[in-house]
Amino acid sequence: MKRTYQPKNRRHKRVHGFLKRMSTKTGRNVLKRRRLKGRKRLTA
C-alpha cells in the first residue's frame, strides 16, 4: 500500500507559499498573526 503523503516542492510552495498567502485577505491575516507571534519562518 502506498503512503498518502507524497511531497512535491512545487505544490507545497503553490499551496502554502508566501505569494499564495499574500493573494488573499485571510492569507494576509495568517502572515500578520505569524509575525505577531514571532515566527522565524512565515511560510513554507
From Swiss-Prot:
GO terms for molecular function: structural constituent of ribosome. Pfam families: Ribosomal_L34 (PF00468). The keyword Acyltransferase does not apply. GO terms for biological process: translation. It comes from the Bacteria. One of its GO terms (cellular component) is ribonucleoprotein complex. The keyword Metal-binding does not apply. Coiled coil: none annotated. Keywords: Ribonucleoprotein, Ribosomal protein. NCBIfam families: rpmH_bact. Belongs to the bacterial ribosomal protein bL34 family. This is Large ribosomal subunit protein bL34. It comes from Desulforamulus reducens (strain ATCC BAA-1160 / DSM 100696 / MI-1).
